[in-house]
Amino acid sequence: MTQEVLEAVKEAKEQSKPRNFTQSVDMIVNIRDLDVKKPENRFNEEVTLPNGRGKEVKIGVIADGELIVQAKDAGVALVINKADLEELGKDRKAAKKAANSVDFFIAQADMMPLVGRFLGPILGPRNKMPKPVPASIKLDPLLERLQSTVKVGIKQQPAIQIIVGSQDMSDEDLAENIETVLTVLDRHLDKGRNQIKSMFIKTTMGPIVRVI
């Protein structure tokens, strides 16, 4: 499928009007013959794109103690301590703003019960529940990996829409990222990519280009 993907990526970029920001490139895949009511047909997997996402990934860290220090030193987009967490639990508007301001959350493992209690109803529907990590972890390697990570999953609808890069990346790099996501679908779908009903590529504000 690589040639078809390459051609669709090129067309999507060419048809996208210039904007005053760097647009992301998305892939949209609709799956046939998949009953999402069955738990075995639902999945959510973190995937490392070989050529990165092309834009900075904003990360929030929920922690106390040494992890807070590491997070601040690393300059992450959002740092939430225990007191902040409790305050967000009282202010739904602020909690939504925090949830929408980052792409991924990391949380100190022993704080996950509090995260579930105070932020679960906000983060869950957004597919942003934190990745639990031990208090002793070195954050930098994880933060670096998350810069190239996307979540590929099927929950309520037999479809996925995810960022696979940015418009200033080469067509070849974007196509390789897309093929990486298709490999994930090969693993999770009974008939692999043969179960794909339709597939599209688009930039953030651009028209949809059909691949299959």
From Swiss-Prot:
Keywords annotated in UniProt: Repressor, Ribonucleoprotein, Ribosomal protein, RNA-binding, rRNA-binding, Translation regulation, tRNA-binding
TM helices/strands, residue ranges: none
GO annotation, cellular component aspect: large ribosomal subunit
Pfam families, per database record: Ribosomal_L1
Record has rRNA-binding as a keyword: yes
Self-association and partners: Part of the 50S ribosomal subunit.
The name this protein goes by in its record: Large ribosomal subunit protein uL1
